[in-house]
Amino acid sequence: TTLTEPEPDLTYLTFVXIVXXEMPIFVMATANSGITSTF
C-alpha cells in the first residue's frame, strides 16, 4: 500500500474477503493463532 492511499483498510478487507471466501477457517486460524504462534 502507498502512503497516499486514503483508506488502505477497506482495500485490505476487500482482498481478505475475497480470499477468505475461499477458506475463511484457514485464514482466521492463520491470522489469529498462526501469526502469534509461528512468529
Curated annotation (Swiss-Prot):
One of its GO terms (molecular function) is metallopeptidase activity. The keyword Transmembrane helix does not apply. It is an enzyme of class 3 (hydrolase). Expressed mainly in the posterior salivary glands and, to a lesser extent, in the anterior salivary glands and secreted into the proboscis (at protein level). It is found in: Secreted. GO terms for cellular component: extracellular region. Its cofactor is a divalent metal cation. Optimum pH is 7.5. Active from pH 5.5 to 11. Inhibited by EDTA, cysteine, DTT and sodium phosphate. Partially inhibited by EGTA, citrate, Tris and glycine. Not inhibited by DFP, PMSF, iodoacetic acid and leupeptin. Requires sodium chloride concentrations higher than 0.15 M for activity. It comes from the Eukaryota. Disulfide bonds: none annotated. The keyword Cell membrane does not apply. Active at 37 degrees Celsius. Activity reversibly reduced to 26% and 0% at 25 degrees Celsius and 4 degrees Celsius, respectively. Complete and irreversible loss of activity after 15 minutes at 60 degrees Celsius. Keywords: Fibrinolytic toxin, Hemostasis impairing toxin, Hydrolase, Metalloprotease, Platelet aggregation inhibiting toxin, Protease, Secreted, Toxin. Its EC number is 3.4.24.-. GO terms for biological process: proteolysis. Metalloprotease with anticoagulant activity. Cleaves fibrinogen Aalpha (FGA), gamma (FGG) and Bbeta (FGB) chains after positions 'Asn-121', 'Lys-160' and 'Pro-102', respectively. Breaks down cross-linked and non-cross-linked fibrin clots. Prevents and reverts platelet aggregation induced by ADP and collagen. Prevents thrombin-induced platelet clotting. Does not affect plasma levels of coagulation factors prothrombin (F2), V (F5), VII (F7), VIII (F8), IX (F9), X (F10), XI (F11), XII (F12), plasma kallikrein (KLKB1) and kininogen-1 (KNG1). Presumably not injected into the host's bloodstream, as feeding by H.ghilianii does not cause prolonged bleeding of resulting wounds. This is Hementin. The lineage of its organism: Eukaryota, Metazoa, Spiralia, Lophotrochozoa, Annelida.
